[in-house]
């Protein structure tokens, strides 16, 4: 195994290799019209590219099936996994990967045709049939077994390797329920021609914390990506945006100045550019900007932030201090 650090390898090749999902609207989705990748997970990766290479464009995206994601990290095929993965005990214990910081709190929900409901009550308890499409290699199968066992309802879970396969099985009637994290499922529903005929039920199967992932073997890289993610959250907490960053960096005093102008030695220790915080905010934006343009009110999905508000606004997002 090479003694080269991940950051040294990235800089040598002048590109960040990022593993992404096979395509979820709002999270990581290839825009064929503009020939580019878009989404919440993509913007998190862009922030890392800015911090290390100074350029949001120096990324090579590698779409991966759920079952291949952590192997690609372990083997060094990718430098960063930004594929909407849930933090779990088993994954960190078995896969030689580390999750950096919770960046999206979400939970699995269910979508079904309105015709599959016994009564006009939007709950799983009132579904006629339960052939459920879910993703292979995710946490969904175990969560579904536990949830429907609790309801004392039988169900048949069918696993698929890609969202396209799962969505097609659902559309063709092979499955009559589709289970995904709520933000992902909103994106899948948006792609249905008759989306108004499909209902996302009130049931919430789980609450999970999603995070980018890195190999456990390089502590510098783990720390670097962790603090890059925290930069996005703390920038929103301090109300620094891509629109006001130039003005605020000129006028900054006290803690805001400490945040925007971190010690050069500290940046060097983490392998980051000395201006990485200001560059990230300028080129990518803060957490709120990223959420709203990909998942929230400025996106086609128009989803509420729910738990993904700052702690000061009743949400679960928090960053340790930059001191």
Predicted regions and their residues:
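Sec-exported extracytoplasmic/periplasmic mature domains
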Residues: 11, 49-54, 78, 145, ...
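Bilobed "Venus flytrap"/periplasmic-binding protein-like clamshell domains
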Residues: 17-26, 34-52, 109-161, 165
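Extended ligand-binding regions for polar small-molecule ligands
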Residues: 1, 7, 50-52, 114-118, ...
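Short, hydrophobic alpha-helical packing/hinge segments within bilobed ligand-binding/sensory domains
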Residues: 6, 45, 68-73, 163-169, ...
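Acidic, polar ligand-binding/catalytic clefts
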Residues: 46, 50, 54, 58-126, ...
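C-terminal functional modules
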Residues: 260-323
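Soluble extramembrane regions of membrane proteins in the secretory/endomembrane system
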Residues: 95, 104, 140, 148-149, ...
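Extracytoplasmic small-molecule ligand-binding "clamshell" domains
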Residues: 2-84, 283, 287, 310
